[in-house]
Amino acid sequence: MALRPRFWKCLSVCRKLECGFAALSTSSVPAVQPDVESKENEAVAPEFTNRNPRNLELLGVARKERGWATVWPNREFWHRLRVVKTQHHVEAFVEHLNGQVVVSASTREWAIKKHLYSTRNVVACESIGRVLAQRCLEAGINFMVYQPTPWEASSDSIKRLQNAMTESGVMLREPRRIYE
């Protein structure tokens, strides 16, 4: 009960000074903080749960769908590069095994389109390769499969896209799966 009159007295003093709300300390001795126990940080949990969904892929142990050897395109991959060339644009994207598009780049994007003379020529394909490779490396995708059709494989623009991706550090072959 003794604190209430002091509080209102201090508040009334502050109102007169027009300083807003302020609190005054009743003790002149600072509170002493106890030392922190550092032994808690040394304890290691007996079980470790890795929550990275791509961990098994990076180790080469994750399942790949098998039994699609007679079907084209082959479905034995973790990530697949797909290139779509339309009448006016070039689009490349990386597809995961479950069908989701992980990373993409297209000449329809204004950030890429404004630097190109044409959105369909060989230079556009090379630029798309560089941009997609940079985005893949930022996303942590270093390996992927690319299976071009025979008429696409002989194309200069597709060759330049492949060269741009490999020069940027992305391997267009996935490591073999470890069966143990």
From Swiss-Prot:
Q: Sorted alphabetically, which keywords does the UniProt record give? A: Chaperone, Mitochondrion, Ribonucleoprotein, Ribosomal protein, RNA-binding, Transit peptide, Transport
* Localization of this protein: Mitochondrion
Annotated GO biological processes are:
mitochondrial translation; rRNA import into mitochondrion
Task: Specify whether Ribosomal protein is a keyword of the entry.
Answer: yes
Q: Which domain of life is it from?
A: Eukaryota
Q: Name one GO cellular component term.
A: mitochondrion
Mention any Pfam family matching this sequence. Ribosomal_L18p
Q: Name one GO molecular function term.
A: 5S rRNA binding
Where is it mainly found? mitochondrion
Identify its protein family.
Belongs to the universal ribosomal protein uL18 family.
Report quaternary structure and partners: Component of the mitochondrial ribosome large subunit (39S) which comprises a 16S rRNA and about 50 distinct proteins.
- State the protein's purpose: Together with thiosulfate sulfurtransferase (TST), acts as a mitochondrial import factor for the cytosolic 5S rRNA. The precursor form shows RNA chaperone activity; is able to fold the 5S rRNA into an import-competent conformation that is recognized by rhodanese (TST). Both the cytoplasmic and mitochondrial forms are able to bind to the helix IV-loop D in the gamma domain of the 5S rRNA.
This chain belongs to the protein called Large ribosomal subunit protein uL18m
To which species is this protein native?
A: Mus musculus
